[in-house]
A protein has these predicted regions:
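N-terminal interaction modules that seed assembly of large macromolecular complexes
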Residues: 9, 13-66
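Amphipathic alpha-helical interaction surfaces
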Residues: 40, 44, 66-77, 97-105
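Long, compositionally biased
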Residues: 52-84, 88
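A structured, charge-rich N-terminal accessory region that forms the first stable segment of a protein
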Residues: 2-3, 7-10, 86-102, 114-125
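Thiolate-centered catalytic microenvironments shared by cysteine-dependent enzyme domains
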Residues: 105-111
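Intrinsically disordered, low-complexity and often Lys/Arg-enriched segments
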Residues: 1-2, 72, 161
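Glycine-rich, aromatic-bearing surface loops/beta-hairpins
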Residues: 121-163
């Protein structure tokens, strides 16, 4: 069962999209660097748990500012953006919010199997597709990586090697 109801999903998706767009396109941060901050400051976990203040209480810009403040990035932040276009970064945050909600996986777990840089690369092919197409593609990528790790683990075990 998802951490929050479907009635909050659109807001959650918009906010995560706005958060990533603001961090990259207004603040000039590298998407991967900002995403790591999102994951390590605890906000990704709170978002995934459905904490109302994080999912829909903050705007996406406010959420980005909170992440940056908690990470110790207290530089002067640009003015909030009024309008957001569907940039690659916006779409990446937007679709990851959907995928996290749908799959019920933690953002850290998603990042381990499908890094945000790979999500951005999926933009040209999937940004106009229904969300379930992204879910299928993401599940396939994550499953393939997990199978590869398990196969390597089996080969090491059969050869008598251990990984420490």
């Amino acid at each position: 069962m998802s951490a929050y109801g479907i009635e909050y999903l659109d807001d959650a998706m918009r906010n995560l999209g706005e958060m990533t767009d603001y961090a990259v396109n207004a603040c000039g941060m590298d998407l991967e660097d900002f995403w790591k901050l999102f994951l390590t400051t605890g906000y990704a976990e709170k978002f995934g748990e459905g904490v109302p203040r994080v999912v829909s209480g903050f705007s996406g810009t406010e959420l980005a500012e909170e992440v940056l403040r908690k990470a110790g990035k207290k530089d002067e932040l640009p003015e909030p953006q009024v309008e957001f276009t569907c940039s690659r970064e916006y779409w990446s945050g937007w679709i990851l919010a959907y995928y996290q909600w749908y799959s019920e996986k933690k953002f850290k777990e998603i990042e381990a199997g499908l890094p945000v840089r790979e999500v951005v690369e999926m933009y040209p092919a999937l940004h106009e597709a229904p969300e379930d197409k992204f879910v299928e593609a993401a599940d396939r990528i994550i499953r393939r990586k997990e199978q590869g790790k398990n196969a390597l683990r089996r080969i090491r075990k059969m050869a008598g090697y251990t990984q420490k």
